[in-house]
């Protein structure tokens, strides 16, 4: 009997030990994340998900001075870096090699400069610095102090100076500075808030700057380079949300986007001489998300957000008549920029079957050319579902748009509802 009791104690002790070990095994820690009673992920599921995490994309950054090549951003390895490509679907040549992702990538128009501006931080600290990469020397130069937060504002039209925002004055407010590549910099003004440089005037004597308050409120000012004097653009008692702004190539006016007195953010033009504001896209009842102007000022291209689908328009600036362009796949368009030849328009296009690639629209030939074809982790994009645009009535009678992804296989299937406000 004692032997049985002793054996019972041993068995129960073993079971209790295993139970304790199992209980401990259900609690795991990964950094600040503590998981309890979460089952381990099967290896086969990890392998399937890994293919999706290895999907790459490419985004357009800028054309080279001669317009024969372009600078793009894509990820090889862990972070997004800058690459150069010289023909459609050509081999990408990596230029930057950093542990941190790289932003910017803007060439100067100064023919004596063979390089571009870019930005990056260190170790994810979000203290972005401005650098210049010189192709002749094959190396980069730090242009900011290495300690503060900075943002590139673009080159002057003559390509000798560049503007940038920095909080170097007090560590909080982002003010505007201009500098050359030798470090001769100048602070244009000292104001509270977050300011960014939007565009240089044709004669490089003024910079258009914007102070961002919120998604519904922002202000734009003209700043004189010589003395830093500021003049607010379009003073109003109403709260206005401004998007981008660009001086017309003839120097006679300003193209800009705003939602002033309208439900949508329209593309507008302000005439410096007559002081008149005109709405270019008054017949388009959607937000204008971005625009660009050809170097000769002949064309203006812009993108609207129409039920969450991007639509590209190209107009002649002399009469705002539409220019016929080739059809684009349905998706999200960004990064518009005309080639120096004034005929080709580069853009980044994200579609349901492609995570993001670069296309070029030839306006004269009405032809669309794909310049990059990003890897999709070995997946077959023929199996990707193209969603359909649907509209449903909300509780207040308004129509709400959405995208419905229908599985290609027979159901029943689980349903995922993702709300974007």
PLM regions: where:
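Multi-bladed beta-propeller domains
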Residues: 19-57, 85-103, 133-149, 169-171, ...
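Serine-hydrolase catalytic core recognition
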Residues: 334-421
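Blade-terminus and WD-like Trp-Asp/Gly-His loop motifs, strongest in beta-propeller folds
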Residues: 60-69, 76, 105-115, 153-161, ...
